[in-house]
């Protein structure tokens, strides 16, 4: 067994996936635990290959005009454009599959 810290793994909470800092390295999927501050608005983007699933564990956010809160899940399919606006300090668990760290295209 290993004991590790999230702060010692990948950027922005990504701790499983196909990148050197991952605590488990795999090309199959990526996992992160991430917090975003109230008022933050992501740059709109999409993925060509991956599907991304986010579970909101705390806080509230709007993605493409739809409000999400604790227990809500968002699924983004390849090619779907989206942007998150955080209404409150928000925490999410996100999974992307497959793991293709370069598959993010800003609009």
What annotation goes with each model-predicted range?
Residues 1-33, 43:
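A short, N-terminal "cap"/entry segment at the start of jelly-roll beta-barrel domains
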Residues 5-6, 64-83:
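Short acidic-glycine-tyrosine-enriched beta hairpin
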Residues 23-25, 33-34, 42-48, 64-66, ...:
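Short histidine-centered beta-strand/loop micro-motifs
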Residues 31-35, 53, 73-75, 94:
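Conserved hydrophobic/aromatic beta-strand scaffold that supports enzyme active sites
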Residues 49, 67, 80, 88, ...:
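A generic "binding-loop/recognition-motif" signal
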Residues 49-62:
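Glycine- and acidic-residue-biased ligand/ion/polar-headgroup-sensing regions
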Residues 53, 88-107:
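A short hydrophobic beta-strand segment most commonly corresponding to one strand
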